[in-house]
Amino acid sequence: QDVDHVFLRF
């Protein structure tokens, strides 16, 4: 899922 990566991106 991209949701997990979205938080890391921030």
Curated annotation (Swiss-Prot):
One of its GO terms (cellular component) is extracellular region. The modification Pyrrolidone carboxylic acid is found at Q1. Keywords: Amidation, Neuropeptide, Pyrrolidone carboxylic acid, Secreted. The modification Phenylalanine amide is found at F10. Its main location: secreted. It comes from the Eukaryota. GO terms for biological process: neuropeptide signaling pathway. It is found in: Secreted. Belongs to the myosuppressin family. Myoinhibiting neuropeptide. This is Myosuppressin. It comes from Namaquaphasma ookiepense (Gladiator bug).
